[in-house]
Every structure is written in structure tokens, then in C-alpha cells.
Amino acid sequence: MDNLKKQVGIKAAEFVKSGMVVGLGTGSTAAYFVEELGRRIAEEQLEITGVTTSNVTSSQARALGIPLASIDEVDYVDLTVDGADEIDSSLNGIKGGGAALLMEKIVATYSKDYIWIVDESKLSENLGSFKIPVEVIPYGSQQVFKKFEAAGYAPTWRLNEENERLITDMHHFIIDLHISQIKEPEKLAEELDLMGGVVEHGLFNNMVKKVIVAGNEGVRIINK
């Protein structure tokens, strides 16, 4: 599995050219993309500026010598590459398994181009196999949780290693929703967008036009 993730990370790095502002995703697959950019900077004199989507990715990028800037310090992001937890046949996706969904969506929204890199196990006809993370402010979060319960979304709190509520890089909580067969992700996203206390959710609808997939038969590209 790690080899598949590495293959798509290296392939995605081929789309990066000198002079670009590049959004650096978060997660085990995106880490291989960041690693390959670090290699190209060291060995090929690639010149880029990175915009990161989490504290974890910031630490990795600095260790690799990748120059960084905040999303507020650049005019735009040329290309963002990130992983995804599940992708449906229309290239809608669920992200946020690494609890970085808010920063990931902000960077993706202000990117000219956006690519997901995954292994083929992340592809499905309809979303629903993976939990949907919802980032909420602490104040009133119990009320939000109860509303999700009443809606039948089987919510659970995202916990840390100490079995306490996980606190995101932006100092929020995460409630994971367990909904099977999401046939109308746009409708669900609109519902979540309008809910008081919800900061962001892990439904990334109509945001990518290119997905790089690694499988047993090699790497392929799905274009929308």
C-alpha cells in the first residue's frame, strides 16, 4: 500500500514547475508528494513556494527545505495536491481523516488547479463508506451533536490518543458522521453549511477535475 501511495505522490510532483505556489496536502499519501518536492528542490533546483494545510505538513516541508508562505501571503495557489479518504464516480470526495479538513478546504478553494492522489481502494460508486468529519466550534458543540443524533447521522466525537476530544490545528472539535450511501452529497453539504456552530465539513464536492490513482496495474489518471 505504501508503494502505491509513493507512486501517485511522485506522479503528482511531475505537474509542479519552478515558479509555482503549491498547496501541500496532509496525510500519508500527500506526504510522499511533499517528499518528492523536497528531493526535486535539492537535486533539480526546483524553485517553488509551499502553502501548507496542517502543522504536520509544515514541519515536514521545513525539514525538507521547502520555502513556505501563508495562504494570506500569496496572490493565489497555482496547484494543490492532496489525498482523499473516499471518492465517488462523479469525483466528489470525503476528506478530513487526518483532522485537517478546514485548512485543506481553504487552500483548495483558492487554488487554480487541484489534484487528488489516492490508491484504488478509495474509489467507490457512492460516498458513505468513510465517515464524514464535521469541524465545530466548542461552544454549542453538544447541541450540534444532538441535532446530528436526531437526524440519524450516528455521530461520534473524534478522540485523541488520550481518549479525549481531539482539538484541531484551528482549535475546534470534530464530530464524525456515519452515513451509508450518500447519493446526494451536494444536498448534505448544503445542510451542513447552514448549521450554526459548524465551521467546515469533509464533503469536497465538485472541486477536482483530476485524480491520480495507483493500483496493481500501475498509475492512471481520471479526468472529469
Curated annotation (Swiss-Prot):
Pfam families: Rib_5-P_isom_A. The active site is at residue 104. The keyword Isomerase applies. It catalyses: aldehydo-D-ribose 5-phosphate = D-ribulose 5-phosphate. One of its GO terms (molecular function) is ribose-5-phosphate isomerase activity. Its EC number is 5.3.1.6. SUPFAM superfamilies: D-ribose-5-phosphate isomerase (RpiA), lid domain (SSF75445), NagB/RpiA/CoA transferase-like (SSF100950). InterPro entries: NagB/RpiA_transferase-like, Ribose-5P_isomerase, Ribose5P_isomerase_typA_subgr, Ribose5P_isomerase_type_A. It is an enzyme of class 5 (isomerase). Pathway: Carbohydrate degradation; pentose phosphate pathway; D-ribose 5-phosphate from D-ribulose 5-phosphate (non-oxidative stage): step 1/1. Homodimer. Catalyzes the reversible conversion of ribose-5-phosphate to ribulose 5-phosphate. This is Ribose-5-phosphate isomerase A. It comes from Lactococcus lactis subsp. lactis (strain IL1403). The lineage of its organism: Bacteria, Bacillati, Bacillota, Bacilli, Lactobacillales. The gene is rpiA.
